[in-house]
Amino acid sequence: VGFGLLAQPSITQVLTWFHSLLFQWQWELFLTDPFIFLFWIFIILTTFVWGRGLFCGWMCPFGSLSELIYKVAGAIGLKRFQFALPMKWHNRLKWIKYFVFFALLAVSVFSMGLAEILAEVEPFKTTFLVGMFNRAWPYTLFVAVLLGLSIFIERPFCKYLCPLGASLAMPSTFRWFGLKRKQECNSCKACAVGCGSLAIDEHGRIDHRECMHCLDCMILYTDEHACPPLAQERKRRTKAGLPLTPIGADGYYIPIKPVPAAKA
């Protein structure tokens, strides 16, 4: 999608729509690239259904490139250098992307041209549309720094700087579907340990505005060895000689039905 179709959605498109709504709507602005237009319809619909995670976590070209670098770096022996920021710092830095988004939105009201220049805070144009080696060195250096940070921190741009992610995070509050949770999730917090998005807080709550839908927590949700409530129930049943029934949609073992007494 990024390198092949050059179809990386951008905050510039969001600003263009906002500017057109305020001043003069022109369909030509949105139909010059039909694939991008259809892609945006898909993004908007899925954001209100599942939140930003489907696009940001699974379809964003730059986010995918950043995650690929992080995973490859871990696989070739650099995992010991990889780290996640402490939650207190993450909770402060995550607001930067919202500041960037609203700043660009405000500037676009007065000067769309200036807003497009400032939107270079997104590395998408340099990475996919023009190419890192076809631009002035400051742009190339900026992208190189972001991709270099991706070796050590999972998706740093997505979590802390991306104005497009911020614009999709806000409507994610009104999504129709969320991730499944157990009663014990508020106190257990085992999923938070492996959450690359740092979207699970100290109370076990998922912030769907930050969630990238990696689904690691959903894998743990039904893992009878790794999910603490399931592991405890598995050990209890094994010790008591009780059968291990399948795990239901609620994330718990299906209750054992008593066997009716045989008729005399």
Predicted stretch roles:
Residues 1-194, 198-202, 209, 216-264:
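Non-ligating segments of multi-cofactor redox enzymes
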